[in-house]
Amino acid sequence: MMKKAVVLLSGGLDSATCLAIARSQGFESYCLSFNYGQRHCAELVAADRVVKALGAAEHRVLNFGLAQFGGSALTDTNIAVPTEGVQPGIPVTYVPARNTIMLSLALAWAEVLGSRDIFVGVNAVDYSGYPDCRPEYIAAFETMANLATKAGVEGHKLSIHAPLIDLSKAEIIRTGAALGVDYSLTVSCYQADEQGRACGVCDSCRLRAEGFAAAGLADPTLYRA
């Protein structure tokens, strides 16, 4: 019997690669995507495309309203998405507690499924300063997961897999390409339009374009202009 894993899938480049890795490691993948009030909801359409291309045992989309709080350029249209290039520090595109909420919901589903493994595509090398994309955060969440769940208390260790955490964007792209990921299906842009066309100037677009250039592969991203 295949081991079950819950895979967080945004529809972007990193999470698509993460799904491909989970499947290559023999996991039966249960994908979890989120509509949290993000302005770039085209990524949810992309997540569906990725699941259909790579395969998954199940794909669910959950709703939670972080737009009610705002506080991020991704959930509050009154805050502009930075376009001047990646800057030091934590950017306004950081969404407070987003990854913690997503991982907690993944943890709940994993327990119900009897899964001991959760995959998340966070990255600490080419990231834009997000505190919840660091190795320390992933390690701390895994510790919490094993303290706070029936499975963990009963001795069934839960593992949070972050296979991209130490990879550059170019290395992520090469890894995914080797596993058959079609990156034209993915959407990374923070302000993609309804057709999934990218702006080309936000931090996420810049990191993606630089990654493809460094990987020596053609960038299949669809840009608005």
From Swiss-Prot:
Q: Recite the UniProt keywords alphabetically.
A: ATP-binding, Ligase, Metal-binding, Nucleotide-binding, Queuosine biosynthesis, Zinc
- Detail which positions bind Zn(2+): C189, C199, C202, C205
Q: What Gene3D superfamilies does the annotation carry?
A: HUPs
The annotated pathway is: Purine metabolism; 7-cyano-7-deazaguanine biosynthesis
Q: Which cofactor does it need?
A: Zn(2+)
The residues listed in the UniProt record as binding ATP, with positions renumbered to this chain, are L9, S10, G11, G12, L13, D14, S15, A16, T17, C18, L19
**What does this protein's UniProt record list under function?**
Catalyzes the ATP-dependent conversion of 7-carboxy-7-deazaguanine (CDG) to 7-cyano-7-deazaguanine (preQ(0)).
Biological process according to GO = queuosine biosynthetic process
UniProt protein name: 7-cyano-7-deazaguanine synthase
